[in-house]
Amino acid sequence: MPPQAPILAVHGLSAIRARRVVLEDVALEIPAATVTALIGPSGAGKTSLLRCLVRLDEPAEGSVRLDGADVRGLDAGLLRRRVALVAQAPVMLPGDVRANLAYGLDAPREAELVAALEVADLDADFLHRPADRLSGGERARVAIARALTRSPEVLLLDEPTASLDARAATAIEVLMLRLAGRGLAVLVVTHDLAQVRRVATRAVRLEGGRVRAQGLVAAVAGSER
């Protein structure tokens, strides 16, 4: 079977922040229906790359293509629905979970919000939970459910389990695999190499703003600790 064409492809991308080069000549491909791990030391440029993928930051050079189309030709709002970013510390708006899920949507149906919660392994009762009373694991899953209400093709997760206990982290790992099984391209930033080996098929290693290796997890992260 021929390899699947990437849903997201980066070519020659360089970025500058505060007069410092944070990404240099980055090239990578993210296939659909796959969990890809983005690894590397702190300060390697991982979060900067995620921000460039959704045009929160504009690169100095290079391009990002979504399903073959340059993202610079897409409306930013449409891009961020198709490529959803969940930050490491997702912000919850005042009010209940329903208000958070519905934010930015045009008259969402209750069934759509419940469906997103259920994919994130949360029941319909969560719609009425105060957002400021969620546990860390619940907050992470609600943030992912909020992204799913936009029906994205690509989900970017910035260290989604960094501050969670083992049980909550396992729930997020199971969710990542479930989403990839439903056809989403999942790109997750993580420092947990054991997690990489559990959930990812492919890995990309960034160091000093450059891609040092990419490919199957065994080849990229197999010998790292």
What is each residue range found by the language model?
Residues 190-191:
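H-loop/switch region of ABC-family ATPase nucleotide-binding domains
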Residues 54:
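Helix-to-loop junction immediately C-terminal to a conserved catalytic motif
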Residues 155-158:
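Catalytic Walker B motif of ABC-type/P-loop ATPase nucleotide-binding domains
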Residues 110-126:
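Conserved ABC ATPase "signature" region
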Residues 166-168:
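Helix N-cap at the start of a conserved alpha-helix in ABC-type nucleotide-binding domains
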Residues 70-84, 181:
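ABC ATPase NBD coupling module
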